[in-house]
Amino acid sequence: YFFSLFLVTIFLYKWLAKKTPSKNLPPSPPRLPIIGNLHQIGPDLHISLRDLARKYGPLMQLQLGRIPVLVVSSAEATREVLKTHDVVFSQRPITSAIDKLCYKGRDVAFSRYSEYWRQVRSTCVTQLLSNSRVHSFHNIREEEVALLIQNIENSASEVINLGEQLIQLTRNVVCRVSVGSEYLSGHKGKLYQKLLAEVTEMLAYTYSIGDFIPLLGWVDWLSGSKAKVEKTAKEVDAFLEGALRDHIKTMASNKGSANDDFLSILLEIREADAGSTLDEECIKAIVWDMILGGTETTSTTLEWIVAAIIKNPDVMFKLQKEVREIGKGKSKIEEVDLVKMNYLKAVMKESMRLYITAFLLPREAKQDVKLMGYDISSGTQVLINTWETARDPSLWDNPEEFRPERFLNSPIDYKGLHYEYLPFGGGRRGCPGIQFAMAVNELAVANVVYKFDFKMPDGERFEDLDMSGVPGISLYRK
């Protein structure tokens, strides 16, 4: 009986194999049972992927535990993913930590590609992050940049950690435009800063073994990481629930009018449209998205930009010359001055090329697709190594050199249409907050170089400044 069953099984296997055409998969390094290629990924993820791609090609398939991952490492392949097959790769993969800490994907960044996502993203683009809305926050930006300059002046004769000052700047700006200035200080301010720091660290460095190898999911419980994530998620929700209730009370006492922060704007939209998708859970998810994305990536980008300027004295001299000529006789640089600063814009672009913070763009195939001749299965996660394409010597002249002049009179911009340069991503999932981030960064950098000259601590040289990166949510400066 068992022998007959064995023969039938072999026959069915061979018959089905003939019926199912073999797939043409992208090149892949050898893998081990269960863990796949996890053992080939080092702590510097972007460098590990670059080294593997140089051996196996710009489209490379890895198996990270149970997860098939397509690594994209060229501008041509990136264009295929983000333009030719943009809809197919319009999903974002969600880890167990993201699921807990970002409202189960009800936010903009991680929501599944659907009508809900389209409506929520449209609300963010047209109501929260439009050019007119970003401009309306100019007083907040100028006040917080003035506070930054004052804090640096108070410590000008001492060695200061400029990175911490820049983080404080972006945290204050984003807090004020998201939930209001009352969350900058006191108990609310401390709680806001604590939760922001905890969640940023968890999303960057909390890896669930169960995401990759479900059979080992018990390790996450044993280590306490799962319980810690769940505890923090509840604290975040309680904080946002409190902010939401405070805003509703303010609107009621002011007869429908509230502050012009993101939370108030979303509540007003819901009030005006009974059929809106903006229920309270959705509103909290969007506001938390704005806080996380606006603070973390903006501050990281700003720190890289300032470090790049300090490391390159010739660039600093040229930039100071431009900024100080345009701002001559003024006590500070204002936003109206920035449009005249072409070299400043080139410096910003070059910094975000060589030290790109969005170093890997995550996507997920929502259906089977043929990509550059290869068969990609539904559910395959995609990592676009923008760090590698921004340093590709076939696309950039002397790519390791920090040379802002390459962007003077260049058509390349931030909008995601040049696939060798994607500091804010591209396609349907491109970052909607480009104008918001650049408004903060340009004003801060212009005022810092306008007001101050920099020197390294005793015994150190500008060229010795460490510009290596540490992977997390973004690529952090070490």
UniProtKB/Swiss-Prot annotation:
It is a single-pass membrane protein. One of its GO terms (cellular component) is membrane. Optimum temperature is 27-30 degrees Celsius. Optimum pH is 7.0. It is found in: Microsome membrane. Its EC number is 1.14.14.148. Pfam families: p450 (PF00067). One of its GO terms (molecular function) is angelicin synthase activity. It is an enzyme of class 1 (oxidoreductase). Not inhibited by (+)-marmesin, psoralen, 5- or 8-methoxypsoralen and angelicin. Pathway: Secondary metabolite biosynthesis. InterPro entries: Cyt_P450, Cyt_P450_CS, Cyt_P450_E_grp-I, Cyt_P450_sf. GO terms for biological process: coumarin biosynthetic process. The record marks 109, 293, 297 as: Substrate specificity. The keyword Endoplasmic reticulum applies. It catalyses: (S)-columbianetin + reduced [NADPH--hemoprotein reductase] + O2 = angelicin + acetone + oxidized [NADPH--hemoprotein reductase] + 2 H2O + H(+). Heme binds at residue 431. SUPFAM superfamilies: Cytochrome P450. Residues 357-361 are annotated as: Substrate specificity. Keywords: Endoplasmic reticulum, Heme, Iron, Membrane, Metal-binding, Microsome, Monooxygenase, Oxidoreductase, Transmembrane, Transmembrane helix. Its cofactor is heme. The chain crosses the membrane at residues 1-17. Belongs to the cytochrome P450 family. This is Angelicin synthase. The lineage of its organism: Eukaryota, Viridiplantae, Streptophyta, Embryophyta, Tracheophyta.
